[in-house]
UniProtKB/Swiss-Prot annotation:
[2Fe-2S] cluster binds at residues 200, 205, 208, 216. HAMAP family: DHODB_Fe_S_bind (MF_01211). It comes from the Archaea. This is Probable dihydroorotate dehydrogenase B (NAD(+)), electron transfer subunit. Pathway: Pyrimidine metabolism; UMP biosynthesis via de novo pathway; orotate from (S)-dihydroorotate (NAD(+) route): step 1/1. Residues 1-87 form the FAD-binding FR-type domain. GO terms for molecular function: 2 iron, 2 sulfur cluster binding; electron transfer activity; flavin adenine dinucleotide binding; metal ion binding; oxidoreductase activity. Responsible for channeling the electrons from the oxidation of dihydroorotate from the FMN redox center in the PyrD type B subunit to the ultimate electron acceptor NAD(+).
Length: 247
């Protein structure tokens, strides 16, 4: 059901990235998402970073409008929706790229996990949106494309070197990164938060199809085994249904 919530707090997290805290706390499983509606603009899905928190990158008209809102302004939300991450025993890797950090942050904070290694990458130091995730993990490994922070390279470079350490790999980020994670792990011991263009968020419109699945209903979190043989990392679909190559 659509309901109005107030923006209780908002602040800059990184370059072109803002956090928005609402005046209502939601019961959710890390990996689930909400649909956020701006009247007269549109409605978009956002993964929850916390019970009352989303973290957003400015990428188009919708997010540009959202960035203009201030504390005390109102937005409309529904959800949470979808399937979230499932906790496993042992040492795990939390792999995030760019703005893929929100569901990974939620998992680090609320997941019933024994030992957590965060492997997080961005283009540059100014684009790292770590929040305070270091308080909820046992180890932090940072990578940047340009070497301005941490290791120069990509999160998947680190994962490839250390994959035998982990009983499970959780990942969210650009789809090409997710495809590489699946390749490195041979589609085993992985849970991936996938993204597709989404309209309804409740499994009716079919716009978020990924192989035989609907991301909003069957995901957004999938196991590697589920994604084997799908188009993950190869192509996605634009709002009008046309195919967009990811290679």
């Amino acid at each position: 059901m659509l309901r109005r919530v107030m923006i209780k707090e908002t602040w800059e997290v990184a370059k072109n990235v803002r956090a928005f805290r609402f005046d209502e706390k939601l019961d959710f499983i890390p990996g689930q998402f909400i649909m956020l509606w701006l009247p007269g603009i549109n409605e978009k899905p956002f993964s929850l970073a916390d019970k009352d928190l989303i973290v957003v990158k400015k990428v188009g008209p919708f997010t540009s409008k959202l960035f203009k809102l201030e504390e005390g302004d109102y937005v409309w939300i529904r959800g949470p929706y979808g399937n979230g991450f499932k906790s496993v025993e042992g040492k795990v890797a939390l792999v995030a790229g760019g703005i893929g950090i929100p569901p990974i942050y939620a998992l680090a904070k609320y997941g019933n996990l024994e030992e957590k290694v965060l492997i997080y990458g961005a283009r540059s130091k100014e684009e790292l949106a770590t929040l305070d995730i270091e308080n909820y993990v046992d180890e932090v490994v940072i990578t940047t494309d340009d070497g301005s922070a941490g290791i120069k390279g990509f999160p998947t470079d680190v994962l490839a070197r250390r994959k035998v350490e982990f009983s499970q790999v959780y990942a969210c980020g650009p789809e090409v990164m997710l495809a590489k994670v699946l390749e490195i792990m041979n589609y085993e011991r992985t849970q991936i938060s996938a993204e597709r263009y989404m309209k309804c968020g409740i499994g009716i419109c079919g716009s978020c199809a990924l192989g035989p699945y609907l991301v909003c209903r069957d995901g957004p979190v999938f196991t590697g085994e589920q994604l084997k043989g799908t188009e993950i990392g190869k192509f996605s679909r634009l709002p009008d249904g046309r195919i967009k190559s990811l290679r």
